[in-house]
Amino acid sequence: MLLSVCSRFISSPSAAAVIRSSRAAASALPRTYSSISATEIAERTKRMLDAKEQSGLSYDELATKLGVTNTYTAQLLMSQAKLTSETAIKLQEALPTASKQDIEDMQTTFPMRAFDEAILKEPNVYRTYEAITHYGEAIKSIINEQCGDGIMSAIDFYCDVGTTTGKHGEKRVVITFNGKFLPHIEQKMDDNSAKSPRD
């Protein structure tokens, strides 16, 4: 999945431009916006991944200690999700070499949930992307048939990655998407709480 996004973010020319503009604007922006410094985010990500490596814990083991999915665990370390105060305590205990400042910043900084397009050149990521796009129309058709006219939320959403063993003894990857169904609405005027620009 898209688990190595942040560690690769600063490698592209477009990211370099973002970094330069971010540095120039840093003094004028509140610290709670993660866009103030892409390099700062990338450096913190490296420190957190180093702390994970030093702990000897796998993503699955760390996820169990935190009580979240393994992909969400990876997102936390890669600054793709916001750390809650409850989970912060568990994370500090699980990764004792992680700095208190990094743990604090992970709670106060709003993530930039985006990715550098260069990540799609990574074969593992691209094949996952390819699978989703290849099966996309079929998946949409089945969602429509089973749930109606709408979409699967990626906000009220859980993602978990695991493995299983095939009938020939081979290891196989299992990726589970669990998202709330969000129906499209009929835009009735009586239900619109915003003032119409035509009024």
Each predicted region: which residue ranges?
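Helix-turn-helix/homeodomain-like alpha-helical modules used for DNA recognition
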Residues: E104-P183
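Recognition helix of helix-turn-helix/homeodomain-like DNA-binding domains
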Residues: G67-L83
